[in-house]
């Protein structure tokens, strides 16, 4: 895969962004099933909604495209939140809801020795890593993570003791 970087001190135009995304997607000419994983509404001002709209517009004419917002343990997005973040062009039927209590499956464990090492001894327990089962089922030709979707532990309330 060719990496594509955009930089401009004055800002990157929507047309330049779409051009770069078309260049990226052009590297995968035979896509039939695509999963896009943007952040949820708690990151509505991240530009991930706009990027997801562009991806859907480019991919949906020739592939089945699903959008599964990375909810973590947050509440599912309602229709108004989806429209606010992703616009009207992506149909409700394209959205999948991540149910963290039922859909997460274990994929491995971060060993206690490693957590002790990287935390300088401040934390010393193993951590089980889980992902949504859809990531591993083999249905999708391409899975795209959009925006700041990063793994993190559930250790407290956001903007508080987390």
What is the meaning of each model-derived region?
Residues 62-73, 94-101:
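A generic structural motif
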Residues 33-44, 66-72, 143-147:
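Short glycine-rich or small-residue beta-strand-to-loop segments that form or flank ligand, phosphate
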Residues 1-16:
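N-terminal amphipathic/basic leader segments beginning at the initiator methionine
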Residues 54-58, 156-162:
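A short, gly/pro- and small-residue-rich
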Residues 77-157:
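An acidic, phosphate/nucleotide-engaging active-site surface
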Residues 43-65:
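Histidine-anchored nucleotide/phosphate-binding helix
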Residues 20-35, 60, 139:
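Glycine-rich phosphate/diphosphate-binding loops that line cofactor/substrate pockets in enzymes
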Residues 2-6, 154, 161-162:
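Small-residue-enriched flexible segments
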